[in-house]
Amino acid sequence: MKIFLVFLSVFFFNGCFGLVYKTPISSSPISYDPYTTPIGSLYAEKLKENPNHSAAILLEDGFDALLHRVGLIRMSQKSIDMQTYIYKNDLSSQVIAKELLNAANRGVKVRILLDDNGLDSDFSDIMLLNFHKNIEVKIFNPYYIRNKGLRYFEMLADYERIKKRMHNKLFIVDNFAVIIGGRNIGDNYFDNDLDTNFLDLDALFFGGVASKAKESFERYWRFHRSIPVSLLRTHKRLKNNAKEIAKLHEKIPISAEDKNQFEKKVNDFIDRFQKYQYPIYYGNAIFLADSPKKIDTPLYSPIKIAFEKALKNAKDSVFIASSYFIPGKKMMKIFKNQISKGIELNILTNSLSSTDAIVVYGAWERYRNQLVRMGANVYEIRNDFFNRQIKGRFSTKHSLHGKTIVFDDNLTLLGSFNIDPRSAYINTESAVLFDNPSFAKRVRLSLKDHAQQSWHLVVYRHRVIWEAVEEGILIHEKTSPDTSFFLRLIKEWSKVLPEREL
């Protein structure tokens, strides 16, 4: 007990104040005309015809999303800015780290901003990149305690700060191209995980929306809670491993055959990209992002405001895909009002068996049956979704991670924003509202395809049940499918937690 009290006293009087200082100003971003870069020159003529428009390529497939990131890095000439919530130290992440290193070696300036919650370890490959002269790495809102196993003490002592995370996801290349959506960096976001793969969606945008995303990145990069790796307590130990940066190419666990196949796919992507062979959509794109100051003080979410406005203005249909769905009473009233007007409301979210957050599902359950009885089409992902084969291997589980909304087959809201209190009031988020009917229809068809292979919740004999088609036969479940009694019990216990804190 005495040792525990000593630890707490050291933590309170040292740890709690360990990161309250002014972060040194890092180097200023280089200035250049993005339209003169190799990527920018491809679309300069078309986009300059209408400066208010942006171009977009939809990234539905996970592996294709990885190819786009790697290909863009290889085509980069001036700068790369990456902002993400999670960066895992696995195969996909190591591939991207290696590509960023190669880009830096040829003079590209690279800046990487990671949320501390999503960092596997201070000794991940991505952290080693900070020792390259052309690469800077910062950690957003970091824990003072660097040992993950001991962080619960800091969470208890500094909960109000620690609970607020940077959930934004941006991948900006040469200030002209930006990937925005739900994907973090890790194997299960790129269909390369044996255990669980995330169903997700993002898009590659060119033009004006990229410059707005860049402005947002700058605000976060210079925010006082974005801490350089050099100021972390583990920096000295990390510096001892700096020599490992030269061995990144050797560390990637991939066979020569797989490497050759991957190289061919990347080269094929670059060739198709430069020949405009990917479907490209043009339209007005509005970039939306929270201020990083939301971490320190309550602020209205511009994404939530835009979502509610588009929802109220919908005339025909709304299709919402959100991995976490806790709408709250105010939004439920909006849903009810729109359904009463004849608007078709479709909702796709995780089931209890597919979710990675049981407590969130417990909160969602409070609204689920109400929405079904209101007349909404509610779908929950089956954890064996697609049962698809990935690179010769079967992943055992699928979970929805996307955050995408389509309004009237015209507007699409795409980004990191879930329909829940955490996205609205606690975390920081980023998204794009894109006005293009063809793009919206393509996204809706993708979501509809997901829904058709999911559980459909319907009212049967006055109760809500789950139904799905399996091998041409309609099947029904009266309790959460593919779950144990113990899992359902945990879900029930979780309902004592305050909804606003989830």
From Swiss-Prot:
UniProt subcellular location: Cell membrane
Does the UniProt entry include the keyword Oxidoreductase? Answer: no
Its membrane topology, per UniProt?
A: Single-pass membrane protein
Keywords of the record, alphabetical order, are: Cell membrane, Membrane, Repeat, Transferase, Transmembrane, Transmembrane helix
Chief localization: membrane
Biological process per Gene Ontology, one example term: cardiolipin biosynthetic process
Which residue windows are transmembrane per the record? Answer: 1-21
Keyword set includes Transferase? yes
Which SMART domains does the entry mention? Answer: PLDc
One GO cellular component term, please give it. Answer: plasma membrane
Q: Which SUPFAM superfamilies match?
A: Phospholipase D/nuclease
Query: Where does the record place the PLD phosphodiesterase domain?
Result: 162-189, 396-423
Molecular function terms, GO-annotated:
phosphatidyltransferase activity
**So what family is this one in?**
Belongs to the phospholipase D family. Cardiolipin synthase subfamily.
Q: Specify the protein name.
A: Uncharacterized protein HP_0190
